[in-house]
Structure formats: structure tokens, C-alpha cells
């Protein structure tokens, strides 16, 4: 998961593959990650992200002049094609051309069609794009990709600890729209991200990731994950998903991730090991 950095939502500069970044965000680090995963015979999606200074939402990126848009497009293309070349050279299964860029996608449709063509000229694997759960229907180029990518932080429950039944019934409702959308484009839906924090009310606003001192609640996380899997995983229009998130150097003696998205050292970890073994 490489990262490029933007100083402001309206500034076209993109900074990536620099020594001051975390190794895992750079070309060298991503290559090492891919090698590690492939050695374990795991399929890999390479999914570039943008981080805007102060944590501003990438879906709100917007330039205020044509000149800046053109410059930003050139910078973004350079970023994406650099990692598309890496994905091809390492035979990565799936490449994601962008993550949660709603405003950029809607305001510059011609650029995205051109970018997809250029990526296809250098990368021969499957392609997707990751749009946020509430704006995935605004993407105009799904029929040019192999999967409809959704970062699936749908609101599921307002309960402190959602029951498995409650969360399952909510997914049974949500999945009807997803199924219809998949049928419209004759393309499978892929959850390019899904997951829940292990906190009270984890299903209320699953996208919230601020480092708050929320009370840990492993059962909430577990029930929400189980419900999603039970409702969706056997559907033929659904391609599966990528769980957010996993730390390579997890310290089981630390409470740092006790109320975070990671399942490591929690009830969900034992469940996921069994679930993935059967799927």
C-alpha cells in the first residue's frame, strides 16, 4: 500500500517514494512486501493511496484552475504508472488505480479513461478502483475495470455491541443494492477495504479511525465481521475483500491496538484463521 503525499487538497504537488517516508510506503518497501506475500502463496493487490496534510479527506481533492488540474493529473499519472510497472514486473494479481478520489473522478472523467488505457498498456493483470461506500455509484468507468471496488464502511448498527443476527439482517438489506449494481455492470463487487474497530458502537460509523481512547469491545468487532461473511461470502456476484488492517510487527504485550481495526491478539483473529482456512 504505497502512499503519496499532498500539501493541500487544492495543491497539485504529489510526493512519493522518498527516504523520509515509512519504508512500507516506498517502492523498495512495497517490493519487499510483495515478495514476502508471494512466498506465502498469497494473492496480492497493490493499492496506491494519497495522504493529504492534516488528514483531509482525499475525496475532496479539487483544483481551482485548469493549469493546476493538468499538473495534478500529470503527477498522479506518474505515481500510478510507477507502481503499475512494479505490479507487472512482479506479476501482482490485482492493481488498484486509485483510492477514494470521488471529486477527482467526477470532475475529470476524460483523464480517468486515459489513465486506465495507459495502465493497461503496461500492466496485464486485473484492475480495480477503490471508491468509498457512499459514493461508489458515482464512478463512471466500472465497465472498463475487472472489479467494482468498494471501501465497505457501511453503517450497520447503532447498538453498543451489535448482535450477529442484527448485523446479518442489515447486510441482507444492503446486499440487494450491491447485487443489482454488480448486475448492471456485469462485474463482480470487491471490498477493497472492510473492517471494524474493536470498540463500543463499532458498527455505527465504521469509517472513523481517529486515535481516540474508546473503550475496547472485541465482541462488537467479531459479530460485525461474522455477519458480513455469512451474508456475502457465498454470493456469486461478490469477489471477496481485503481486511483492514494488519501490522507486520504486532506487539501482543501492548495495548496500542486494543481498540483499533487490527484483529491481532483478539477474538476475531482466531475466528478469521478458521474462516479463511475454510474459504
PLM feature spans:
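Active-site clefts of carbohydrate-active enzymes
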Residues: 150-165, 180-222, 244-260
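Aromatic- and acid-rich polysaccharide-binding/catalytic face
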Residues: 7-8, 80-99, 131-169, 187-188, ...
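Surface-exposed cleft-lining segments at the edges of enzyme active sites
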Residues: 16-21, 68-71, 98-105, 157-170, ...
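Aromatic-lined carbohydrate-recognition surfaces of secreted/lumenal glycan-active proteins
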Residues: 43-53, 94-105, 113-137, 182, ...
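Aromatic- and acidic-residue-enriched segments that line the glycan-binding/catalytic groove
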Residues: 53-71, 145-147, 205, 209-210, ...
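Substrate-binding cleft and catalytic face of glycoside hydrolase catalytic domains
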Residues: 1-14, 25-105, 201, 246-249
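Alpha-helical scaffolding segments of alpha/beta enzyme cores, especially the outer helices
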Residues: 28-39, 78, 82-85, 110-121, ...
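Aromatic-rich peripheral "rim/lid" segments of glycoside hydrolase catalytic domains that contact
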Residues: 10-20, 202, 206-210, 222-227, ...
Amino acid at each position: 500500500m504505497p502512499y503519496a503525499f499532498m500539501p493541500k487538497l487544492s495543491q497539485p504537488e504529489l510526493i512519493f517514494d522518498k527516504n523520509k517516508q515509512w519504508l512500507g510506503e516506498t517502492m523498495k518497501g512495497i517490493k519487499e512486501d510483495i515478495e514476502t506475500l508471494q512466498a506465502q502463496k498469497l494473492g496480492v493487490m497493490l493499492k496506491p493511496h494519497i495522504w493529504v496534510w492534516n488528514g483531509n479527506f482525499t475525496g475532496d481533492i479539487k483544483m481551482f484552475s485548469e493549469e493546476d488540474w493538468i499538473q495534478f493529473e500529470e503527477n498522479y499519472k506518474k505515481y500510478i504508472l510507477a507502481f503499475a510497472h512494479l505490479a507487472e514486473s512482479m506479476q501482482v494479481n490485482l492493481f488498484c488505480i486509485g483510492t477514494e478520489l470521488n471529486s477527482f473522478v467526477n470532475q475529470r472523467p476524460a483523464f480517468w479513461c486515459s489513465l486506465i488505457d495507459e495502465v493497461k498498456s503496461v500492466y496485464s493483470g486485473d484492475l480495480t478502483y477503490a471508491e468509498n461506500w457512499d459514493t461508489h455509484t458515482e464512478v463512471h468507468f466500472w465497465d472498463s475495470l475487472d472489479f467494482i471496488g468498494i471501501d465497505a464502511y457501511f453503517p450497520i448498527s447503532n447498538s453498543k455491541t451489535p448482535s450477529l443476527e442484527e448485523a446479518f439482517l442489515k447486510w441482507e438489506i444492503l446486499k440487494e443494492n450491491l447485487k443489482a449494481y454488480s448486475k448492471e455492470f456485469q462485474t463482480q463487487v470487491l471490498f477493497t477495504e472492510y473492517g471494524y474497530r474493536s470498540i463500543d458502537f463499532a458498527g455505527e460509523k465504521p469509517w472513523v479511525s481517529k486515535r481516540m481512547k474508546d473503550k475496547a469491545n472485541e465482541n462488537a468487532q467479531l459479530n460485525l465481521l461474522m455477519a458480513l461473511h455469512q451474508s456475502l461470502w457465498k454470493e456469486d456476484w461478490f469477489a471477496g475483500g481485503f481486511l483492514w488492517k494488519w501490522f507486520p510487527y504486532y506487539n501482543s504485550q501492548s495495548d496500542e491496538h486494543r481498540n483499533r481495526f487490527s484483529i491481532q491478539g483478539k477474538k476475531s483473529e482466531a475466528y478469521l484463521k478458521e474462516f479463511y482456512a475454510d474459504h
